Structures are given as C-alpha cells and as structure tokens.
C-alpha cells in the first residue's frame, strides 16, 4: 500500500519531503515506499507496532540512517529540534540542568533562561540531571530542543511510561510550545490509539503507511468529560485505524479486506 501524507491545504512548501523511502537491513525490510511531506505548523503523530519502523523513519529523517533507496529533501530554512526518548547519563559524573543545556554549541545564558522559563522549569536550573523525575527530564530535553528556535520539533515517544493525566499535561505543553515557536511537530507515539488531540494527521506505520487519518475529539464526548475531566478531554485524542489489510507476526502483509483491523504488536 502506498499512501502519500500529509495533505497541504495552504499551498505551502514542505520543510521536509520523504520520497519513496525504502530501508532494508540484511534482507529484512524496515521501511517500504514511504512518502511523507512535513509542512510548516503541521502536527503529525506516527503510531504503529513495536518493530514497525517508527524509529527507523525518525533516524532517516534526522540523517542518522541512510535509506536503501529513495530521497529525503530538506528546505533551506529547516531547523530541527529533537527530543529523544531517553538519554543515558553517567551517575559518576553529576551534571546540572544548566550545564547540560550549555553544552549545546553557541548557546547563551539568556537563551537557557528563556527556554527554562518557557517550560516552567526555572527552579530546576541547578538540579542534577541524574536526580530528575521522568516528567522533569522530558521538560529539560524539550528545553534543549527549542534552544535553536526550531521550525520543526521532532519527539520520539515523549509519553512513554506516563499515565493518562501526565500525557494530557505533556500534550498541552507541546501545544503551547508549538504555538510560541510557530513550528511544525512530528511525534512518535508508543500508543496505537491515544494521541495528541491537536494532531492534524495520524499515520500508522508498519513498514509502510498502513492508514492515515485524524483523531476523534474526546472533548465532544460528555461521558468522557465526566469521567476524565476537561484537561484530559481537551488534550488527548483517540485514533481509529482503518486498514484494508493485515500483517503477520513477522510484519508481512498477508491479505486485504474491506473492514478496519487492529495493528498487531510483533513483540507479543
């Protein structure tokens, strides 16, 4: 299946174009015929099963992985801010948040102060990175990503290990950051269905793009509002998959049908 994403409703030039991207490792296909345009101010969420190629797609986009075939085209003015899933710190070498952020080349003290203030973590400035909570670490990594004032923010599974309330708070923070920077957002999610409500498009990837669509707005559901409250309902969306095929446990396409099917997690 070959689905081209994302729709361009304002005749903008894309920040990044992925054209017919294929990545093969030792005869094993990781990505097949991926076509993706990332436009200014768009918010894109990528979901899919473990081992489905989400990380390979990000690495290809970030120039960390050379595609076997296909082309990645970058606009002249693209500036990427990257938030990794996690970082590994040596506990025998303590480093403060301020010192960690200052390691980014050419960054001034005032720029660090602005980023910390923007994410409401100025109080963490002198704290050791090794002692931060998971949520605090995510905010610090986000602060580092926005230091160069990116017009594309790339986040790798930022809500992994975070409960639904924490996810809503993080999605709200990402939305506020996107609005302040006037940037595009490309986010990978470990959850197949729970996504950021502001996503303009959700792509399901399992080697290829299986389906694409928009999340359901949960704030329109009075039952959900009563159960979870306004903050979660406003920031969390639910994505319904619409596949016309399904995959084996090894990821191979093994048939087509007209009904929507669920993604299979190949690690199970």
Curated annotation (Swiss-Prot):
Q: Cite the PROSITE patterns for this sequence.
A: ABC_TRANSPORTER_1, ABC_TRANSPORTER_2, ZNUC
Sorted alphabetically, the keyword list is: ATP-binding, Cell inner membrane, Cell membrane, Ion transport, Membrane, Nucleotide-binding, Translocase, Transport, Zinc, Zinc transport
UniProt domain ABC transporter: residue ranges:
16-231
Q: What is its EC number?
A: 7.2.2.20
- Catalytic activity from the UniProt record: Zn(2+)(out) + ATP(in) + H2O(in) = Zn(2+)(in) + ADP(in) + phosphate(in) + H(+)(in)
User: What is the enzyme's main class?
Assistant: translocase
Entry GO CC? ATP-binding cassette (ABC) transporter complex
Q: Identify the InterPro entries for this entry.
A: AAA+_ATPase (IPR003593), ABC_transporter-like_ATP-bd (IPR003439), ABC_transporter-like_CS (IPR017871), Metal_Ion_Import_ABC (IPR050153), P-loop_NTPase (IPR027417)
Q: Which residues bind ATP?
A: 48-55
| Recorded topology in the membrane | Peripheral membrane protein
| Any one Gene Ontology molecular-function term assigned to this protein's record | ABC-type zinc transporter activity
Q: What does this protein do?
A: Part of the ABC transporter complex ZnuABC involved in zinc import. Responsible for energy coupling to the transport system.
| Family per record | Belongs to the ABC transporter superfamily. Zinc importer (TC 3.A.1.15.5) family.
Any idea what this protein is called?
A: Zinc import ATP-binding protein ZnuC
Q: Which organism is it from?
A: Haemophilus influenzae (strain ATCC 51907 / DSM 11121 / KW20 / Rd)
């Amino acid at each position: 299946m070959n689905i081209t994403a994302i729709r361009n409703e304002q005749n903008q030039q894309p920040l990044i174009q992925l054209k017919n991207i294929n990545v093969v490792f030792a005869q094993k296909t990781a990505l097949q015929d991926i076509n993706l345009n990332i436009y200014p101010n768009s918010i894109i969420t990528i979901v899919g099963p473990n081992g489905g190629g989400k990380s390979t797609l990000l690495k290809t986009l970030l120039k960390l992985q050379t595609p076997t075939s296909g082309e990645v085209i970058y606009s002249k003015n693209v500036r990427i801010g990257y938030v990794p899933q996690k970082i590994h710190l040596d506990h025998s070498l303590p480093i403060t948040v301020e010192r960690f952020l200052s390691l980014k080349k050419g960054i001034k003290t005032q720029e660090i102060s602005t980023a910390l203030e923007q994410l409401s973590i100025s109080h963490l400035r002198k704290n050791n990175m090794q002692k931060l909570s998971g949520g605090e670490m995510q905010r610090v990594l986000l602060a580092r990503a926005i230091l160069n004032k990116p017009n594309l923010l790339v986040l790798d599974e930022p809500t992994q290990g975070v409960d639904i309330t924490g996810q809503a708070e993080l999605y709200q923070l990402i939305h506020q950051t996107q609005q302040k920077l006037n940037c595009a957002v490309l986010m990978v999610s470990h959850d197949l269905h729970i996504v950021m409500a502001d996503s303009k498009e959700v792509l399901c990837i399992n080697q290829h793009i299986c389906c694409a669509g928009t999340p359901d707005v949960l704030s329109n559901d009075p039952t959900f509002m009563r159960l979870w409250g306004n903050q979660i309902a406003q920031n969390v969306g639910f994505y319904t998959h619409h596949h016309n095929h399904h995959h084996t446990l090894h990821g191979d396409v093994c048939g087509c049908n007209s009904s929507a099917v669920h993604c299979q997690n190949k690690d199970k």
